[in-house]
Amino acid sequence: MMYGYITLPDDTGIAHSEMKPDGSVKVYFEKPVEGGFHSAVCWLPAYRWESIVGFFEDDIRSLDKILHDNAHLILEFSQEGGFENASGY
């Protein structure tokens, strides 16, 4: 299952999976563009990027910084059923 985390000002959406038994969490990035989407996956806590489609190197660097700044929250929420469950909303 994937849980919505945040939508950035440029409409890039960030979602994450539940924590897997090995402690990993899949973080998915998707940005709508004309004719489709740019997308990428990064696995926490290793910060291993894969399946990058449409994003440029500079984009990934920016997303990586955002991910580093938010990883502690994403890892916590991944164990709580996403932000909505963790926050009690």
What are these regions (language model features)?
Residues 1-16:
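Negatively charged, low-complexity tracts enriched in Asp/Glu with abundant Ser/Thr
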Residues 53-89:
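Acidic, low-complexity intrinsically disordered segments
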Residues 15-56:
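A short, structured beta-strand/loop element
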